Regions:
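Cytochrome P450 heme-thiolate "Cys pocket" and heme-binding signature region
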Residues: 53-55, 59, 314, 350-382, ...
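Central I-helix of cytochrome P450 enzymes
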Residues: 106, 117, 121, 179-187, ...
Length: 425
């Protein structure tokens, strides 16, 4: 945006995509959020996305369609559901902490910090019994999914009708879908035979309703949505949590101040015992928001097509059917909205500061805001508090450089946090 301005466009294969980093234009765009059109290939991500995630709830559009697709899932990701899983979050966090080495650089990606989130969401979707017996299968399927989705970055897969051809990429998409369907049907068969319990999990209750035609979604929509919820969006939670930890390791004064707040308020208690950590630990909320501002989990929001004959954004007239994305990095680092945006200053999110609406893009905006954001926030809060209760954090080998991913979806952040070093308090 420094080069092209707050509203610009790029070519994505043969498709022009409008990019927004202007808060007013973003607010204008999202006031009509329900009507925005999302196609099964997410407008420009191509055959791989369409084949694996094309019918997930994220692709729904229109008020009735969004309610139809999101409705069966919402109660499982409500504030009540998240509160009911706080014990699981605490358990999985402590189990992860017990695996970490002391006094040597830790690569949080290699150490599988993301498994804290993956295990919690597995429990929410399938219940504890499946978590304990079949988690290794879910990890294998996650690897298979990410390896397949990485093929989105091959330009030819975005060509029209690519999915009609017998290619190696399309065979990999089919192989994942077959493996994912087979695994989930296997679990439901065990459930029907009484060999495993559902534990009130989303999957078994929803599949049972599908069998009786009591829902307006079908099995493919359910499985594509579980791809998104369980396997894909784990990367978003990992980015938020890992960068929060590395930011604290790099900014010792902030770490000291936050630890003092934690010690004073919680008095050594397990953070997962509290459902209102955001209200109890106000400085921590500032820290987490500032970390999310500087390291947004999504480099670009998912594209949404305009539906009006002309949509005016930032003084430009955008024709009908044009994909639009939010450039979160440019927005979150804009000097228009943030003083000294390259500095880590949690106080900019204090209650006394007025944040310009639309200038901070974290979990999306509007009625299609990330379904699992409550879980993501709860997990990040518990993990950060637990780390600071047990450890002093430092940056690995004085290396503040951010590592760049070699693989991954183009709209996720391309960065991985630097290594950290732990010392027991």
């Amino acid at each position: 945006s420094e080069k092209h301005g707050p509203v610009y466009y790029i070519w994505h294969c043969f498709t022009p995509v409008v990019i927004l980093s202007d808060a007013k234009a973003i607010r204008t765009f999202y006031t009509d959020h329900y009507s925005h059109h999302r196609e099964r290939d997410m407008s420009c991500l191509g055959a791989v996305f369409k084949g694996i995630l094309g019918r997930c709830l994220a692709t729904s559009h229109g008020r009735d369609e969004v309610k139809r697709c999101r409705g069966p899932f919402e109660k499982y990701f409500s504030s009540t559901a998240t509160a009911n899983h706080m014990t699981v979050i605490g358990r999985e966090c402590q189990a992860f902490l017990n695996t970490l080495p002391i006094g040597e650089p830790i690569d949080l990606k290699a150490c599988r910090l993301e498994d804290v989130t993956l295990r919690v969401i597995t429990c929410a979707v399938y219940g504890d019994e499946v978590l304990e017996k079949y988690f290794h299968k879910i990890v294998d399927l996650q690897y298979m999914l990410l390896e397949t989705l990485d093929l989105i970055n091959i330009g030819t897969t975005r060509l029209p009708f690519y999915s009609k051809f017998q290619t190696k990429t399309n065979r990999k998409v089919d192989a994942f879908n077959e493996a994912w369907t087979r695994f989930n049907r296997f679990l439901f068969t065990l459930f029907e035979e009484g060999k495993i319990t559902g534990g009130g999990g989303l999957f078994f209750e929803t599949m049972a309703l599908l069998k009786t035609h009591a829902l307006d979604i079908d099995e493919e929509e359910l499985l594509h949505s579980l791809d998104e919820i369980l396997l894909l969006n784990i990367d978003v939670s990992f980015a938020a949590t890992s960068f929060a930890l590395s930011d604290l390791a790099q900014h010792q004064a902030v770490q000291t101040k936050l630890r003092a707040e934690i010690d004073d308020v919680l008095q050594g208690c397990d953070p997962s015992k509290f459902e209102d950590l955001d209200k109890k630990l106000t400085y921590m909320e500032m820290v987490l928001k500032e970390s999310a501002r500087m390291h947004p989990a999504l480099a670009l929001s998912l594209p949404e097509k305009t539906v009006k004959s002309v949509t005016e954004l930032g003084g430009y007239q955008i024709p009908k059917g044009t994909p639009v994305c939010v450039d979160t990095y440019s927005l979150n680092y804009s000097v228009t909205y943030w003083e000294n945006p390259d500095e880590f200053k949690p106080e900019r999110f204090s209650a006394s500061r007025n944040i310009v609406p639309g200038s901070f893009f974290r979990f999306g905006m509007g009625p299609r805001k990330c379904l699992g954001y409550r879980y993501a926030l709860a997990i990040t809060r518990v993990v950060v508090v637990s780390f600071l209760q047990k450890f002093e954090l430092d940056i690995g080998e004085n290396d503040s450089d951010v590592k760049v991913k070699k693989t991954g979806l183009s709209f996720f952040t391309p960065y991985i946090c630097p290594d950290i070093i732990l010392q027991r308090r």
